[in-house]
Amino acid sequence: MFACDELLLNASTIDATGLQLSNQAIVIRKGRIEWCGSEDQLPAHFQESAKSRKDCHGQLITPGLIDCHTHLVYAGHRAAEFRLKLQGVSYADIAKSGGGILSTVQMTRDASEEELVDQSLPRLLALKNEGVTTVEIKSGYGLDLQNELKMLRVARQLGEVAGIRVKTTFLGAHAVGPEFKGNSQAYVDFLCNEMLPAAKNMDLVDAVDVFCESIAFSIRQAEQIFQAAKDLNLPIKCHAEQLSNMGASSLAARYGALSCDHLEFLDENGALNMVKANTVAVLLPGAFYFLKEKQKPPVDLLRQVGVGMAIATDSNPGSSPTTSLLLMMSMACQFFSMSIPEVLSAVTYQASRALGMEKDIGSIEAGKIADLVLWSIKDSAALCYYFAYPLPHQTMVAGEWVS
């Protein structure tokens, strides 16, 4: 009979739906969960063979948290724009004066890879400090071949330096590259024919995203990009129905999207198509708050038809300058009227589904990677009750406790 590496006893945990369980035991072996369940059903040989035991004293253990939608690789900031917005200056006027997303594009292009790592690493470490063990990072502030690849390389490097799992998403279709101003179709053609294949060939991309909106890319252009991704066997995601209902969610679902994100203007048809495709709804309360949006995502509709809901930070310099997934959890309860179990599932199991990783992470189940967080609380509601607190007591990544 083999020995287990770690035995966690007398823990409270949550299941994949976010419901709390008491008196639980977790057996860790070779970086994975070997066994988990009620402590009174723990096989005796695990008790006898464990190399290390930890009595959790009823404290909560969750899966490692997952931030499944971020843009945290970028240079500079847009605090000066925030000051202007508070003075009543419109986004259109800010953009005309050289601000907006293209200002971040310019600063990101001007930064070296080393500078991008130096500026972005603190944001990733802030997430890690809150018990996040997997982070999705999008490109989208390069908008040309050289700089999109640079961003993706930096994202990969950040995961290695920070010691947590990073999944990369190619978001060249975030805005039209400035060199293609006035000719968005030429940019989309270049993206599909040159940029995306290069990222794939260099093994820098895990998924492909498109911002489908009247101010960004059309339904036809989004479909062209989705087809290019499909031809390269890359899964897709979509910034969909954030500012209007364009039918992007239905299109993305037709291509088997892992997730559709934002979704403030999602309708029933789009939601039903997402259910059929097992597409997750990623809700982003940070952007809702920072942009002072009035239209909430239709949580009741998503709940009614059975669309899984994830929560993420949307960490970015323009519309959600945050690195606190814990704060987003509280906001999801308060702004979107999500229940505590829904929110706990949203940053664990549902977030893993949004990355196509539910077979390996996102829940405490035998066979899954041992990404776990031990909290200094006993009631899971406290994770949503507090604002960005408490911080983890200990975090485990692939079976190893990390600092």
Swiss-Prot record:
Fe(3+) binds at residues 69, 71, 239, 314. Transmembrane segments: none annotated. Zn(2+) binds at residues 69, 71, 239, 314. One of its GO terms (molecular function) is zinc ion binding. Its cofactor is Zn(2+); Fe(3+). Pathway: Amino-acid degradation; L-histidine degradation into L-glutamate; N-formimidoyl-L-glutamate from L-histidine: step 3/3. GO terms for biological process: L-histidine catabolic process to glutamate and formamide; L-histidine catabolic process to glutamate and formate. Keywords: Cytoplasm, Histidine metabolism, Hydrolase, Iron, Metal-binding, Zinc. Its EC number is 3.5.2.7. The keyword Cytoplasm applies. Signal peptide: none annotated. It catalyses: 4-imidazolone-5-propanoate + H2O = N-formimidoyl-L-glutamate. N-formimidoyl-L-glutamate binds at residues 141, 316, 318. 4-imidazolone-5-propanoate binds at residues 78, 141, 174, 242, 319. It holds the Pfam family Amidohydro_1. InterPro entries: Amidohydro-rel, HutI, Metal-dep_hydrolase_composite, Metal_Hydrolase. Binds 1 zinc or iron ion per subunit. It is an enzyme of class 3 (hydrolase). Belongs to the metallo-dependent hydrolases superfamily. HutI family. Catalyzes the hydrolytic cleavage of the carbon-nitrogen bond in imidazolone-5-propanoate to yield N-formimidoyl-L-glutamate. It is the third step in the universal histidine degradation pathway. This is Imidazolonepropionase. The gene is hutI.
